[in-house]
Regions:
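Short, Lys/Arg-rich N-terminal segment immediately upstream of the first membrane anchor
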Residues: 1, 39-42, 189
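Alpha-helical transmembrane segments
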Residues: 1-15, 46-57, 92-93, 101-104, 138-141
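Transmembrane helix-loop-helix hairpins at the membrane interface
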Residues: 98-216
Length: 216
C-alpha cells in the first residue's frame, strides 16, 4: 500500500467517523423532532426547481473544468471520485467495495442531511436580508469555494456557487413571506437546500445500485 493509498484510507475513516457522529446526533430524541419538522415542511416549491438548478451547476462545472488547473482537487489527487463524503475512490474500482463503501457512507449521510443543510444555511445565508447584492454574490461564491476545501475539483466548487445563489434567493423569499424573521428565512433556505441534497443522494443511490448490478 502506497502513501497515497494510506492517505485516502485515512480521509475516508475521518469522514466516516464524522458522518456517524452527526447521524447519531440527528437521531437523538431532542433533535429528531426538529429534523422531522424540517423534512415535513418541504413543499413543491423546494423540489421543483432542483433539477434545473442542478443542470445549471453541472453545465457550469463541465465548462469550468475545461480550464487548466480548475480540474484539480486534493481528493481526486488521492484517487477519489467527487467528494470524500460519497466514499468513492479508484482504488476500489472493479471490487465489491466500489459500491459497498459509498452505500455505507450514504446510509450514514441520510439522517445527517437536514442538520448539515441547516448548518450551511446558518453559516452562509443568515443575515442576507441586510447584505447588498454584491455581498450576497460573494457569499454564494464562498459557499461554492468551501467545497474545494472538502476535496472536490476547483471548477466544480466554483459551479456550486450557483446553488449558493439559489439558496440565497430562497432565504430572501422566506424572509419576505415569514414576517421578516431570520428563523423563517433559514427554514425556507434549509428546506430548499435539503431537497437539493436529497435529489443528489437519490441520483447517487441509483448509480450505486446500477454499479452493484453490473458487478454482480
Amino acid at each position: 500500500m502506497t502513501l497515497v493509498d494510506l492517505l485516502a484510507v485515512a480521509v475516508l475513516a475521518a469522514v466516516g467517523t464524522r458522518l456517524f457522529s452527526i447521524a447519531r446526533f440527528s437521531l437523538r430524541p431532542g433533535r429528531r423532532a426538529h429534523v422531522v419538522g424540517l423534512i415535513r415542511g418541504i413543499r413543491a416549491r423546494h423540489v421543483v426547481p432542483v433539477p434545473f438548478v442542478l443542470a445549471a451547476v453541472l453545465a457550469a462545472a463541465l465548462l469550468l473544468m475545461e480550464v487548466p488547473g480548475l480540474d484539480w482537487g486534493w481528493w481526486t489527487a488521492l484517487g477519489g471520485f467527487g467528494n470524500p463524503v460519497t466514499g468513492g475512490t479508484e482504488r476500489t474500482v472493479g471490487t465489491v467495495f466500489e459500491w459497498l463503501v459509498p452505500l455505507l457512507f450514504v446510509a450514514l449521510l441520510l439522517p445527517a442531511l437536514p442538520l448539515l443543510a441547516e448548518r450551511e444555511e446558518q453559516v452562509f445565508r443568515r443575515g442576507d436580508e441586510r447584505r447588498s447584492i454584491p455581498q450576497r454574490a460573494a457569499r454564494g461564491l464562498a459557499f461554492g469555494l468551501v467545497h474545494a476545501v472538502m476535496g472536490i475539483p476547483l471548477g466544480a466548487a466554483l459551479a456550486l456557487s450557483i446553488g449558493g445563489w439559489y439558496f440565497s434567493w430562497c432565504y430572501l423569499r422566506g424572509y419576505r413571506n415569514g414576517n421578516r424573521t431570520q428563523l423563517a428565512a433559514l427554514a425556507e433556505s434549509t428546506r430548499a437546500h435539503l431537497a437539493y441534497n436529497a435529489f443528489i443522494v437519490a441520483l447517487l443511490v441509483v448509480s450505486l445500485i446500477a454499479t452493484a448490478g453490473m458487478s454482480g
